[in-house]
Amino acid sequence: MAYTKADLKHDLAAMGLTGNETILIHSSMKSIGTVEGGADTVLDALMEFFAEGLLLLPTHTWRFINEENRMFDVRRSPCCVGILPELFRQRPGVVRSLHPTHSMAAYGKDAAAYIAVSYTHLTLPT
């Protein structure tokens, strides 16, 4: 049995979420299971559910931005953390931060204001 958009939104509400929160989601389509319509349905559900809040997904590029490839293009550089963030960053109304290796994408309430300062956070080597 495949999940539907309605199932996903119901499950979010069942977790006690209201949709007006600020939420950072680290995602995995494999962990979600089979969804009618695939990744686009998951993103539709998240964006509709959190329409009054702020939805954040990491759009990290650390796998691609390195000594050999130092160029980061906020509009074109693909992310390396899954299909959901990659599709999310390309959707209308989603804004992406300027951090060259650990960017974030945001949608919803005050998304542009949140993203405007997020790239200034330090990322230190481990």
Q: Where are the regions a protein language model picked out?
A:
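Conserved small/polar residues in nucleotide/adenosyl-binding loops
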Residues: 120-126
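General beta-strand structural signal in soluble alpha/beta enzymes
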Residues: 56-57, 96-101, 116
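Short amphipathic alpha-helix with an adjacent loop that forms part of the alpha/beta core around
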Residues: 12-14
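N-terminal active-site beta-alpha-beta segment that forms phosphate/nucleotide-binding
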Residues: 16-69
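Ligand-binding beta-strand-loop-alpha-helix segment within the catalytic cores
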Residues: 69-108
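N-terminal basic/disordered segments at the start of proteins
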Residues: 5-8
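Glycine-centered helix-coil hinge/cap
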Residues: 38, 50, 82, 105-116
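Flexible, glycine/proline-enriched loop segments at strand-loop-helix junctions
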Residues: 32, 70-76, 113-119
